[in-house]
């Protein structure tokens, strides 16, 4: 079972199935659980272009591995958590094989990321289409929906 703070490695069909996020696995932080599913923020390696003002992600949290013990984060390089978009994954269960090692970020980081999201009134909510996400990540499992079936004797 996944919990808030876990870091997953997924291919995501955004903005479409041919995009960079769909071609190569990226890390996503499981930030919040709602009725509509799991909210995930994409992570990206920090690049020189990110030092310039106005370069997306505009709302971001930076993780610098050299400043924290390895147990607080699975990231090996300077990483930006993109708080401009929150992807929602629903109707699937995530196997442990898609989690990083260590599997999560520390609580302190998660709280800071959620505060950035709270302060960002324009955070885009993006629901992920279940068939596309499963076709890119076959180890994801469809969740069985509870139904009110009456069993006859």
Where are these regions (language model features)?
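Compact nucleic-acid interaction/catalytic patches
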Residues: 17-25, 30-69
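C-terminal terminal-subdomain/extension
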Residues: 63-153
């Amino acid at each position: 079972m996944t919990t808030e703070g876990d870091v997953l490695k997924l291919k995501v069909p955004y903005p479409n199935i041919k995009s960079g996020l769909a071609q190569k696995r990226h890390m996503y932080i499981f930030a919040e659980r709602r009725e509509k599913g799991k909210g995930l923020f994409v992570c990206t390696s920090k690049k020189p272009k990110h030092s310039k003002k106005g370069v997306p992600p505009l709302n971001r949290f930076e993780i610098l591995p050299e400043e924290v013990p390895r147990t607080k984060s699975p990231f090996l390089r300077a990483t930006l958590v993109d708080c401009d978009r929150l992807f929602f994954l629903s109707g699937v269960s995530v196997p442990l094989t898609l989690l990083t090692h260590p599997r999560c970020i520390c609580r302190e980081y998660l709280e800071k990321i959620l505060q950035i999201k709270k302060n960002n009134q324009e955070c885009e909510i993006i629901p992920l289409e279940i068939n596309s996400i499963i076709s890119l990540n076959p180890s994801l499992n469809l969740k069985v929906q509870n139904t009110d079936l009456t069993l006859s004797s």
